Curated annotation (Swiss-Prot):
Native species: Cercocebus atys (Sooty mangabey)
Residue span, Ig-like C2-type domain: 29-106
One GO cellular component term noted in the UniProt record for this chain: extracellular space
Subunit text: Heterodimer with IL12A; disulfide-linked. The heterodimer is known as interleukin IL-12. Heterodimer with IL23A; disulfide-linked. The heterodimer is known as interleukin IL-23. Also secreted as a monomer. Interacts with NBR1; this interaction promotes IL-12 secretion.
Record gene name: IL12B
Purpose: Cytokine that can act as a growth factor for activated T and NK cells, enhance the lytic activity of NK/lymphokine-activated killer cells, and stimulate the production of IFN-gamma by resting PBMC. Associates with IL23A to form the IL-23 interleukin, a heterodimeric cytokine which functions in innate and adaptive immunity. IL-23 may constitute with IL-17 an acute response to infection in peripheral tissues. IL-23 binds to a heterodimeric receptor complex composed of IL12RB1 and IL23R, activates the Jak-Stat signaling cascade, stimulates memory rather than naive T-cells and promotes production of pro-inflammatory cytokines. IL-23 induces autoimmune inflammation and thus may be responsible for autoimmune inflammatory diseases and may be important for tumorigenesis.
Gene Ontology molecular function: any one: cytokine receptor activity
UniProt xrefs under SUPFAM superfamilies: Fibronectin type III (SSF49265), Immunoglobulin (SSF48726)
Keywords, in A-Z order: Cytokine, Disulfide bond, Glycoprotein, Immunoglobulin domain, Secreted, Signal
Region forming the signal peptide: 1-22
Protein name: Interleukin-12 subunit beta
Length: 328
């Protein structure tokens, strides 16, 4: 992820005395300090500059502690670990003049830390963000998992392409589900994003990038996912599933309809369907049939059930969940 390098002037609050960009502004008054994490690591030297034209009578404190760390318009600190992070504030005469929150971002053996989010391991290892789209309208849902529920914040940025990014607008992340896994709780967070100038019928040439900034207490981490919408398509299940017995026959005619959320016209945005009849025992063999039509004739015995699911006809993305109806 690219971040704009700090521009230093008289009113700047943080200055990094290093030729490398090891500190950058996440948002107003919040800065990420990138740290190589190993024993006896030197850390990063940071110079704080108070946002005031005053020169004298200025003192510095860290977080809520009243302990004075230094005096003068600038304060030089060495950020080596989380104990050196936090909110630094400059004061004069009992009044807070300006402040800056420093957040370490750990790198061990050349790899950025991924302690805040849980690896979902689907469709592959080190999958922290997962995204899906119900159609080609440019609306996307992304989600991630964590075992953390307190002192946790997220911010999301998304675009199509990185060299000349096109707009994708994301809402705020919300807690969407809570599960118990053995002795642990697992929290699912999600966000809705919309491509600003989506063209459903256009060929995708650049992937969509989704970037999540995660902060737990004073720890910062960054997670990214890159994809084409065609790769994350997962239609809603077919609707209005019906069975019609045929006279003098063991067979029934089953029919269904495209989901309301699927892109139109269906002659262009087509689905293919997988159908099956499942006996009362789940161990019974299931015969699956693939069809591009929205009806079929099958043998549907008593106590069995008929199921159907859908997938984009022209691109091998995800199948949706089965929707079922009893045979009798």
């Amino acid at each position: 992820m690219c971040h704009q390098q700090l521009v230093i002037s008289w009113f700047s609050l943080v200055f990094l005395a290093s030729p490398l960009m090891a500190i950058w502004e996440l948002k107003k008054d919040v800065y990420v300090v990138e740290l190589d994490w190993y024993p006896d690591a030197p850390g990063e030297m940071v110079v704080l500059t108070c946002d005031t034209p005053e020169e004298d009578g200025i003192t510095w404190t860290l977080d809520q502690s009243g302990e004075v760390l230094g005096s003068g318009k600038t304060l030089t600190i060495q950020v080596k670990e989380f104990g050196d992070a936090g909110q630094y504030t400059c004061h004069k005469g009992g009044e807070a003049l300006s402040h800056s929150l420093l957040l370490p971002h750990k790198k061990e053996d050349g790899i950025w830390s991924t302690d805040i989010l849980k690896d979902q391991k689907e469709p592959k290892n080190e999958t922290f963000l997962r995204c899906e789209a119900k159609n080609y309208s440019g609306r996307i849902t992304c989600w991630w998992l964590s075992t953390i529920s307190t002192d946790l914040t997220f911010s999301i940025i998304s675009s199509r392409g990185s060299s000349n990014p096109q707009g994708v607008t994301c809402g705020a992340a919300t807690l969407s589900a809570e599960r118990v896994r053995g002795d642990n709780k697992e929290y699912e967070y999600s966000v809705e994003c919309q491509e600003d100038s989506a063209c459903p019928a256009a060929e995708e040439r650049l992937p969509i990038e989704v970037m999540v900034d995660a902060i737990h207490k004073l720890k910062y981490e960054n997670y990214t996912s890159s994809f084409f919408i065609r790769d994350i398509i997962k239609p809603d299940p077919p609707k209005n599933l019906q069975l019609k017995p045929l006279k003098n026959s063991r067979q029934v005619e089953v029919s269904w309809e495209y989901p309301d959320t699927w892109s139109t016209p269906h002659s262009y945005f087509s689905l293919t369907f997988c159908i099956q009849v499942q006996g009362k025992s789940k161990r019974e063999k299931k015969d699956r049939i693939f069809t591009d039509k929205t009806s079929a004739t099958v043998i549907c015995r008593k106590n069995a059930s008929f199921s159907v699911q859908a997938q984009d006809r022209y691109y091998s993305s995800s199948w949706n969940e089965w929707t079922s109806v009893p045979c009798s």
